[in-house]
């Protein structure tokens, strides 16, 4: 009994030792597997951390870009607002040195532009003034130039030297007129028309021609409304007739041709008459013959039907 108990105890001790050894020292294969798993886990953790860090970096970059773009747009809007405020109100002061310098520049530029615009609107530039003055001077100088040209073209009207004397009595003769009008100047010619039936009687008017136009004017002043043989007369100046241009010779119309002689007219007419019936006769015969045949054929076909 004691031996069996000792054996049991020894077996139990061996089992416990085996258990302890199994728990204390694992096998080398298990150790390798565990080390591989740990290394894999570590590599996975590292990859995940790298990916997360890269993602974080990308997010940070995008955030920085957005913030930079928003900041630049905000700075642009601020600078534009400050410049507009500076141009509209030059007395307003800005907080920053950069904004103050920008506003002062924009204000100065706006003031210079406004001053230039006001000066341009109020008083035109010298070049515009010159242009306007040239236009005005040209427009003003055009009509007198035209008048001068017209005056140059029109020759000065000659002063009259001939005087018409009317309402004369039949007792007045050329000698009487010569005596009266010779007191005002030298007379070149006296024309006193006479009646055909009674050549010793005048028609009641006369023409007196002086050598100088001044003498003719004197005679007009003194004798217009004067009396000769107890009757008032009229004295008027006679203007010299304008020299008429010679009449133009009208050229004969080109369409009208000179008539042909008789010996040329007759042969072509005879030839035309002789040729025309010869040409027409065969054409008429040809045109009639097929018509008759067709008419006959149609009538025959109708009768057969």
Swiss-Prot record:
Subcellular location: Nucleus; Nucleus speckle; Cytoplasm
Biased composition (Pro residues): 242-261
Region of interest called Necessary for interaction with the cleaved p110 isoform of CDC2L1, as start-end residue ranges on this chain: 1-220
Listed Basic and acidic residues bias regions: 33-59
PROSITE patterns cross-referenced by the UniProt entry: RRM
Any single biological process term in GO: negative regulation of mRNA splicing, via spliceosome
Region of interest called Necessary for interactions with UPF2 and UPF3B and UPF2-dependent NMD, as start-end residue ranges on this chain: 69-121
InterPro entries membership: Nucleotide-bd_a/b_plait_sf, RBD_domain_sf, RNPS1_RRM, RRM_dom
CDD domains documented for this protein: RRM_RNPS1
Chain segments carrying region Necessary for interaction with TRA2B, nuclear localization and exon-skipping: 238-305
Cross-referenced PANTHER family: RIBONUCLEIC ACID BINDING PROTEIN S1, RNA-BINDING PROTEIN WITH SERINE-RICH DOMAIN 1
Domain notes: The RRM domain is required for the formation of the ASAP complex.
The name this protein goes by in its record: RNA-binding protein with serine-rich domain 1
Provenance organism: Bos taurus (Bovine)
């Amino acid at each position: 009994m004691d031996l069996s108990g000792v054996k049991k105890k020894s077996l139990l001790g061996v089992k416990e030792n085996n258990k302890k050894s199994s728990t204390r020292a694992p096998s080398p294969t298990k150790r390798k597997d565990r080390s591989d798993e740990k290394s894999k886990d570590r590599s996975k953790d590292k990859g995940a951390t790298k990916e997360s860090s890269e993602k974080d970096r990308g997010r940070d970059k995008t955030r920085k870009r957005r913030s930079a773009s928003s900041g630049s747009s905000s700075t642009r809007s601020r600078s534009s607002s400050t410049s507009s405020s500076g141009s509209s109100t030059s007395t307003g002061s800005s907080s920053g040195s950069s904004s103050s310098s920008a506003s002062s520049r924009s204000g100065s530029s706006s003031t210079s532009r406004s001053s230039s615009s006001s000066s341009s609107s109020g008083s035109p530039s010298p070049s515009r003034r010159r242009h306007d003055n040239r236009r005005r001077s040209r427009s003003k100088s055009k009509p007198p130039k035209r008048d001068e040209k017209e005056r140059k073209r029109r020759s000065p009207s000659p002063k009259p030297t001939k005087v018409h004397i009317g309402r004369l009595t039949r007792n007045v003769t050329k000698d009487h007129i010569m005596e009266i009008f010779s007191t005002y100047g030298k007379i070149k010619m006296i024309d006193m028309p006479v009646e055909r039936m009674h050549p010793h009687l005048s028609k009641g008017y006369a023409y007196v021609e002086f050598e100088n136009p001044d003498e003719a004017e004197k005679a007009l002043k003194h004798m217009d409304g004067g009396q000769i043989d107890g009757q008032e007369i009229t004295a008027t100046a006679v203007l010299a007739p304008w020299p008429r241009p010679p009449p133009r010779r009208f050229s004969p119309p080109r369409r009208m041709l000179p008539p042909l002689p008789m010996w040329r007219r007759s042969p072509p007419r005879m030839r035309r008459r002789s040729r025309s019936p010869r040409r027409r006769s065969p054409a008429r015969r040809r045109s009639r013959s097929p018509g008759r045949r067709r008419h006959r054929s149609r009538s025959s076909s109708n009768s057969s039907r």
